[in-house]
UniProtKB/Swiss-Prot annotation:
Subunit and interaction comment: Interacts with SHLD1, SHLD2, SHLD3, RIF1 and MAD2L2/REV7.
EC number annotated for this UniProt entry: 3.1.-.-
Biased composition (Basic residues): 626-635
Entry's transmembrane regions: none
Name of the protein described by the UniProt record: Single-strand DNA endonuclease ASTE1
A Pfam family that the UniProt record links to this protein: XPG_N
Molecular function per GO: 3' overhang single-stranded DNA endodeoxyribonuclease activity; single-stranded DNA endodeoxyribonuclease activity
Length: 679
């Protein structure tokens, strides 16, 4: 993020460029993207298992509780999608490649920093629970953050070195020196958080009192996320950049030092820019000047007034308005009710699918959820005025396509994906919210290939995850086994268990059973973290499930939540689900695990019964019985009744030792066998 090497440079000179703060009794504008990455990577969370979202949520809650204790009022500003120019695409692709390498490293036991897939959604859910004010910008948030902080005369909290360039009235506090875990007290009563604040005045003073207005030119010459022109190397190689007196630390920042010392000789950006252009071929000067000036604008005040959103709920973004998007979409994006994935698809007809810690030798885990995305794309087709106006009714038909940047092996590629043609009343995005709840729910469930009746016994909070699980089970590329399904459903019991434990008026016996089961789950989770090797096939299967859940949630949000959004903070824990997989494979049975808590046992039965009818019959076969399809068909053709009898006998034996729902599975197997022979 930001300018390469600048953050480490200013930190090497922290005594000169930073002042100590005792932060309390103030507003603070927080870079949400930087914060959730920092909390994810600096809190000893295990990143191998696809997200311990409960642990992450606890860390986020503690962070904001520290702020509240110091009477610090946070305003979180999140990045949105890419802007219409898509000028960061090269940078985003480079980062995608880096993430693939880090995900691969994590998958084979190495180190790396890869955010779990749903971390942003979890972060937003915690903000909502804690009633922390937040906004999601239409595109990148940096300028809006700077403008709001200057309006309120308060500091910015981030880790982005771009904030060393912005002229902030009250300064910029880097996250890595923001000691929220080490609250101190003044006179025994007033809490404060020790922090460091970057001083732009001290920075400019260090470089011969250079004009602050030169810093945006420095940023684009040095190379930031927006500009990386090969021709600038011509300037850097020809200009004799003065390094000044450098310490051993300074040698690794020779380009930064040289540029700053060189720029400090000029009175203003115009004079400096003219001198830059002298080193370039004449034929390139005009184009380079235009690009540099345009990039320097990124460090000026934003036209967006976020204070209006926080005070009145009004979000006005000129760039978004110019696209002519429906009002309800703009409002939902600002409130974080729609993901930046949606705005990227809307504005650019291009999305980037993030890599998870998965099996790099298999097709990427997002392939399984592509049909859901095709429905999302179909809903978005008629809402991008700047794109081709090709009609679905044109002859010959020319379906409008979207591009997806996805992982292939350990690299990326761009795939062209056709949107699904939808009924006329579904294809007008501006009127999508006018559809009845029943019709919106029907479209969601039809996409997930799930009957509504299946979900009737399921608690409201789990309807969407169970519908998604049914979708996941129906896809042959999933390769899920029974213990994968069982582990997933057991993990979904955590939220209800916490509700029982915290519910007043529950009988002591019920509460004790819930506490014991919850404690057992915590033990399994802790034990998993001590393990050394990741089961890559299992990891890939659960990455596929998370992709289905993410896209199911995005479709649900786009349809104005016909099913309630699940509480992700208590729905999925990667360490727990992997640990349960290991236990169920070894010796533990679901029956014995749930025997201490009848309420959890009953809920599990509802969840299992809902999903089992969508699972392939093979996953219910005992170990050693899952032969190839051809062998099963051959045996069925030679002796239908004999085969059915053997299957029943083996399954009953498995049921008696392991799972009380086995009889239900036997009935399902017999029906499946009879249906196969009728065909």
């Amino acid at each position: 993020m930001g300018i390469r090497g600048l953050m480490s440079f200013v930190e090497d000179h922290s005594n000169e460029f930073f002042t100590d703060l005792k932060l309390r009794d103030t507003k603070i504008v927080i870079d949400g993207y930087a914060l959730f990455h920092r909390l994810c990577f600096s809190s000893n969370l295990d990143l191998r298992y696809g997200g311990d979202y409960d642990s992450f949520a606890d860390v986020v809650q503690k962070f904001f509780e520290s702020l509240f204790a110091c009477n610090i009022c946070p305003y979180v500003v999140l990045d949105g999608g890419c802007d219409i120019s898509d000028k960061k695409l090269t940078t985003l692709k480079d980062r995608a490649r880096e993430k693939i390498q880090m995900a691969h490293s994590l998958s084979v036991g190495g180190s790396g920093y890869v955010c779990p897939l749903l971390i942003r959604e979890v972060f937003i859910q915690v903000l909502i629970k804690l009633r922390v004010c937040f906004v999601q910008c239409f595109s990148e948030a940096d300028r809006d953050i700077m403008t709001l902080a200057n309006h309120w005369n308060c500091p910015v909290l981030s880790s982005d070195s771009d904030f060393c360039i912005f002229d902030l009235k009250t300064g910029f506090c880097p996250l890595n020196s923001f000691q929220w875990r080490n609250m101190n007290t003044i006179k025994g009563t007033q809490n404060y958080i020790p922090a460091k604040c970057f001083s732009l005045d001290a920075f400019c003073h260090h470089f011969s009192n250079m004009n602050k207005a030169l810093l945006p030119l420095f940023a684009v010459l040095c190379g930031n996320d927006h500009v990386n022109l090969p021709i600038m190397e011509t300037f850097l190689s020809k200009a004799r950049l003065p390094l000044g007196a450098t310490s051993s630390k300074g040698r690794r920042h020779h380009r930064i030092l040289g540029l700053l010392n060189w720029l400090s000789h000029f009175a203003n950006p115009t004079e400096a820019l003219d001198n830059v252009l002298k080193y370039l071929p004449k034929k390139d000067r005009e184009n380079v000047k235009e690009l540099l000036c345009c990039s320097m604008e990124e460090y000026q005040q934003s036209q967006v007034k976020l204070q209006d959103f926080f005070q009145c709920g009004t979000y006005v973004c000129p760039d978004a308005l110019n696209l002519g998007l429906p009002e309800w979409v703009l409002v939902a994006l600002a409130k974080g009710q729609l993901s930046p994935f949606i705005s990227d698809a809307l504005v650019l007809r291009r999305t980037i699918l993030p890599t998870q810690v998965e099996n790099m030798q298999q097709p990427n885990a997002h392939r399984i959820s592509q049909p859901i995305r095709q429905i999302i794309y179909g809903l978005l087709l008629n809402a991008s005025p700047h794109l081709d106006k090709t009609s679905w009714n044109a002859l010959p038909p020319q379906p409008l396509a979207f591009s997806e940047v996805e992982r292939i092996n350990k690299n990326i590629r761009t795939s062209i994906i056709d949107a699904v043609e939808l009924a006329k009343d579904h294809s007008d995005l501006s009127r999508l919210t006018e559809l009845s709840l029943r019709r919106r729910q029907m479209l969601l469930l039809e996409t997930l290939k799930v009957k509504q009746t299946i979900l009737e016994p399921i608690p409201t909070s789990l309807k969407l995850p169970i519908a998604v699980s049914c979708y996941w089970l129906q896809h042959t590329e999933t390769k899920a086994k029974l213990h994968h399904l069982q582990s997933l459903l057991l993990t979904m019991l955590v939220g209800p268990l916490i509700a029982i434990i915290n519910s007043p008026g529950k009988e002591e016996l019920q509460e004790d059973g819930a506490k014991m089961l919850y404690a057992e789950f915590q033990r399994v989770k802790a034990q998993t973290r001590l393990g050394t090797r990741l089961d890559l096939d299992t990891a890939h299967i659960f990455c596929q499930w998370q992709s289905c859940l993410q896209m199911g949630m995005y479709l649900n949000q786009l349809l104005s939540t016909p099913l309630p959004e699940p509480d992700l903070t208590r729905l999925y824990s990667g360490s727990l689900v992997h640990g349960l997989c290991q236990q169920l494979l070894a010796s533990t049975s679901v029956e014995s695990l749930l025997s201490i808590c009848p309420e959890a046992k009953q809920l599990y039965e509802y969840l299992f019964n809902a999903t089992r009818s969508y699972a392939p019959a093979e996953i219910f076969l005992p170990k050693g019985r899952s032969n190839s399809k051809k062998k099963r068909q051959k045996k069925q053709n030679t002796s239908c009744s004999k085969n059915r009898g053997r299957t029943t006998a083996h399954t009953k034996c498995w049921y008696e030792g392991n799972n009380r729902f086995g009889l239900l599975m036997v009935e399902n197997l017999e029906e499946h066998s009879e249906a196969s022979n009728i065909e």
